[in-house]
From Swiss-Prot:
Source organism phylogeny: Bacteria, Pseudomonadati, Pseudomonadota, Betaproteobacteria, Neisseriales
CDD domains, per database record: EcFpg-like_N (cd08966)
Database matches in NCBIfam families: fpg, PRK01103.1
Protein name stated in the entry: Formamidopyrimidine-DNA glycosylase
Gene designation: mutM
Organism: Neisseria meningitidis serogroup A / serotype 4A (strain DSM 15465 / Z2491)
PROSITE patterns: FPG_CAT, ZF_FPG_1, ZF_FPG_2
SMART domains for this protein: Fapy_DNA_glyco, H2TH
C-alpha cells in the first residue's frame, strides 16, 4: 500500500504538470473503486481550473475554485502524467480507470489494479471532509513533537507500534515506516505506549521524521505496484533495516530479525537492539 512518502512523491510529480491548468474532459472507464466515482465527474470538472495540489495524510487533494478532488491510492494505485509529446497517451489497459484531460493535452491517469483506491468530489470546507476532519498532525510538521507524542501515548496501553500507526495520533506512518522508525529508535514494537519515557518519545519523533524524509528523497518504496508520476519505481526498499528481512542479520548486532504479527500486520524487529 502506498504510504506517506509514496503519496508525497506522487504529489510532487503531478503538481507542476496540472496546477493552473483547465480540465477539458474526464474519461471514466471504471466507476467501482473503494467508493463509487460520481458518474457525472466529467461534467462537474469540465472547464474548471486547478488552483493547487496538496496532501493530507495519504490523501491527495486537487483544489478548484469551489471544490476539491480527493484521491486515495488504495493498495495499488498510482497517478501518471502524460504530455502531448508522449506517444503513450492513447494506450490504456484494464487497470487504467480514469483519465483527467487538460486543455493543453496533458493527461493525468489513475491506475489501480486492485481497485481499492478512491476519487471523490467534495464541495464543502476541505478540513471538514469526513475523511479528513479527525486526522492527527502531519509527521513532518512542527505539531508532531516530543511533548505532543508523550502526552498522547501516556493515555494508551496498547503496543507503541499500533499507536504510531493510528491516524488519530499521527498520520501517514504506515507499516513499513513504523517498523523502520522503531528499529532506529531502539524501541520494541510491543512496548506499551504509555511506558515510553519522554526522551524515548523525543528519539521516536526524530527517527520518524528522518525515515520519512529519506524515503521521500528516494522516491518511496516499490514492493509491488507503486510507481511515480513518470512511471519510475522508488528505491527506499534498498535501505530497509528490518522490514521484510525476517531471519536475516540485524545490521547493528548481527542477530536475526524476527517477524511477528501485531494488529494483523507483519512486524519486523531485532529482539536484541529493541527494548
Amino acid at each position: 500500500m502506498p504510504e506517506l512518502p509514496e503519496v508525497e512523491t506522487t504529489l510532487r510529480g503531478i503538481a507542476p504538470h496540472i496546477e493552473g491548468k483547465t480540465v477539458e474532459a474526464v474519461v471514466l472507464r471504471q466507476l467501482k473503486l473503494r467508493w463509487q466515482i460520481n458518474p457525472d465527474l466529467g461534467e462537474i470538472l469540465s472547464g474548471r481550473q486547478v488552483l493547487s495540489c496538496g496532501r493530507r495524510a495519504k490523501y491527495l487533494i486537487v483544489r478548484f475554485q469551489t471544490g476539491i478532488l480527493l484521491i486515495h491510492l488504495g493498495m495499488s494505485g498510482s497517478l501518471r502524467i502524460f504530455t502531448p509529446s508522449d506517444g503513450r497517451i492513447g494506450r490504456s489497459d484494464r487497470h487504467d480507470h480514469v483519465d483527467i484531460v487538460f486543455s493543453d493535452g496533458t493527461v493525468m491517469r489513475y491506475r489501480d489494479p486492485r481497485k481499492f483506491g478512491a476519487i471523490l468530489w467534495y464541495e464543502g470546507i476541505e478540513e471538514h471532509h469526513p475523511l479528513l476532519e479527525k486526522l492527527g498532525p502531519e509527521p513532518l510538521s512542527e505539531a508532531f513533537c516530543t511533548d505532543y507524542l508523550y502526552v498522547r501515548l501516556k493515555a494508551q496501553k496498547r503496543a507503541v507500534k499500533l499507536a504510531l500507526m493510528d491516524n488519530a495520533v499521527v498520520v501517514g506512518v504506515g507499516n513499513i515506516y513504523a517498523n523502520e522508525s522503531l528499529f532506529r529508535a531502539g524501541i520494541s514494537p510491543h512496548r506499551p505506549a504509555n511506558r515510553l519515557k519522554k526522551k524515548e518519545c523525543a528519539l521516536l519523533v526524530e527517527t520518524v521524521k528522518a525515515v520519512l524524509r529519506r524515503a521521500i528523497e528516494t522516491g518511496g518504496s516499490t514492493l509491488r505496484d507503486f510507481v511515480d508520476s513518470d512511471g519510475k519505481s522508488g528505491y527506499f526498499q534498498q535501505e530497509y533495516t528490518v522490514y521484510g528481512r525476517h531471519n536475516q542479520p540485524c545490521p547493528q548486532c548481527g542477530g536475526l530479525v524476527v517477524k511477528e504479527t501485531l494488529g494483523q500486520r507483519g512486524t519486523f524487529y531485532c529482539p536484541n537492539c529493541q527494548k
